[in-house]
Curated annotation (Swiss-Prot):
SUPFAM superfamilies: Actin-like ATPase domain. ATP binds at G12, T13, S14, M15, D16, G17, V18, D19. Belongs to the anhydro-N-acetylmuramic acid kinase family. Pfam families: AnmK. This is Anhydro-N-acetylmuramic acid kinase. It catalyses: 1,6-anhydro-N-acetyl-beta-muramate + ATP + H2O = N-acetyl-D-muramate 6-phosphate + ADP + H(+). It comes from the Bacteria. Keywords: ATP-binding, Carbohydrate metabolism, Kinase, Nucleotide-binding, Transferase. Catalyzes the specific phosphorylation of 1,6-anhydro-N-acetylmuramic acid (anhMurNAc) with the simultaneous cleavage of the 1,6-anhydro ring, generating MurNAc-6-P. Is required for the utilization of anhMurNAc either imported from the medium or derived from its own cell wall murein, and thus plays a role in cell wall recycling. It comes from Shewanella sp. (strain ANA-3). GO terms for biological process: 1,6-anhydro-N-acetyl-beta-muramic acid catabolic process; amino sugar metabolic process; peptidoglycan turnover.
Length: 369
């Protein structure tokens, strides 16, 4: 059988590394061939975190970081290919998400901005790059996010089966597969790992709360939880998308200002419940019973999964590995899939999900030649 090799590159709002995946799309289902995670050097991580907040000298910093992130993404590709022992000539294209530094689709003139110069990636890998997937959807009046529901529909939809696919990265998003292959809903529910990561990084200088152990040692404060859940985003109708612009450390500190008496682990437990309650509320609005398959980093947080199960007693809950897709790499595979759709001239957005006026071929091609 002929191979159809594509590479997907993903670095999410958690900024916990660049995921690189090599995928073969020759068969009916995507086949994961090789994976690699490239750590983000601390100086680059600090620069990105700083750029995500309003500041001075932003254009100079943006330009430098755009190139630096491009070089890091290229390094991820070259290390992936070395690991897989596959030549660059065998790859049709790279699908690069880039690193989001602003996502503000609801302004009068909405925009989204991902950096990681695709020209640099193409030049340093010798492979054509397809990138800038979100801005066409925004140009068509959409949110530019989430984009993964189209991939979820293609890969996980089954006639007659109601399924929810939950992707928990920095931000959490859900795809509702109604059992009718043509009908799909999807949107960002709110914070995924972003606030629980930010709090443990601030207090304990640890990158993340492994298995939710720190959250499990605390007790949720119901008053704080109610205040956090009163954020206007949670009552917005979909299509909707969000990011660090709404849910960030500055917002968290503002919310905590009236709760100085709380223990740090109680705050962590409350933040985990914010993630779980906001997800569960939105799922229950779609359907009271069904199947839920989880992917993204949150799928590996056992405390999160237990709390979600308690809030959704009539759901059968598993990870996407039960459907043949490794939950750790699902989003990287989705961006390889988006590259394939562009290469074949096929649309990749779902107007019912993003609010765009029509379907469209997403992204632009940056030649290695």
């Amino acid at each position: 059988m002929n191979k159809a090799y594509y590479i997907g590159l993903m670095s999410g709002t958690s900024m916990d590394g660049v995921d690189a995946v090599l995928v073969d799309f020759a068969g009916e289902q995507p086949q994961l061939i090789a994976t690699h995670t490239e750590a983000i050097p601390s100086h680059l991580l600090k620069g990105l975190q700083r750029l995500c907040l309003p500041g001075n000298d932003e254009i100079n910093r943006l330009g430098r970081l755009d190139r630096s992130v491009g070089k890091l993404f290229a390094l991820a590709v070259n290390n992936l290919l070395a690991k897989a022992q596959i030549a660059k000539e065998d790859i049709i294209a790279i699908g690069s998400h880039g690193q989001t530094v602003r996502h503000m689709p609801n302004l009068e003139v909405g925009f989204t901005l991902q950096i990681g110069d695709p020209n640099t990636i193409a030049t340093e890998t010798g492979i054509d790059v397809i990138a800038d997937f979100r801005r066409k959807d925004i140009a068509l009046g959409g949110q530019g996010a989430p984009l993964v529901p189209a991939f979820h529909q293609q890969t996980f939809a089954q006639v007659g089966k109601k399924r929810v696919i939950l992707n928990i990265g920095g931000i959490a998003n859900i795809t509702y597969l109604t059992g009718n292959r043509e009908e799909v809903l999807g949107f960002d529910t709110g914070p995924g790992n972003t606030l629980i990561d930010a709090w443990i990084q601030q207090v304990k200088n640890e990158p993340y709360d492994k298995d939710g152990e720190w959250a499990a040692s605390g007790k949720t404060d119901q008053q704080l939880l109610a205040q956090l859940l009163s954020h206007p985003y949670f009552s917005l109708a979909y299509p909707k998308s969000t990011g660090r612009e709404l849910f960030n450390q500055a917002w968290l500190e503002q919310q905590l200002s009236q709760f100085n008496q709380l223990d740090e682990e109680d705050i962590q437990s409350t933040l985990l419940d914010l993630t779980c309650h906001s997800i569960a509320r939105d799922i229950l609005k779609l359907a009271p019973v069904g199947e839920l398959f989880v992917c993204g980093g949150g799928a590996f947080n056992s405390e999160l999964m237990q709390r979600l199960a308690a809030l959704l007693p009539d759901y059968h809950i598993d990870t996407t590995s039960a459907l043949g897709v490794d939950p750790k790499w699902a989003e990287g595979i989705a961006f390889a899939w988006l590259a394939m759709r562009h290469h074949l001239g096929l649309p990749a957005n779902l107007p019912a999900v993003t609010g765009a006026s029509r379907e469209a071929v997403l992204g632009g091609r940056f030649s290695a030649k």
